């Protein structure tokens, strides 16, 4: 199961551009593992850019799996996986 979110997040990356943490709803999540990266078109019929997705294991008070995506210069939490 998963829950679609679609809310903006603030992402932190190291100097190698690896995702290290993100802030969602004023809560800090530390990324323990980057599981995968991929690209998907975003409303190609409107000329919008590709979205860069990343699936991570991250923790706040407990560990979870999250999918985030970057569209332009902005990052969003796409879904939370159970």
Question: What is the meaning of each model-derived region?
Answer:
Residues 1-82:
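N- and C-terminal low-complexity/disordered segments
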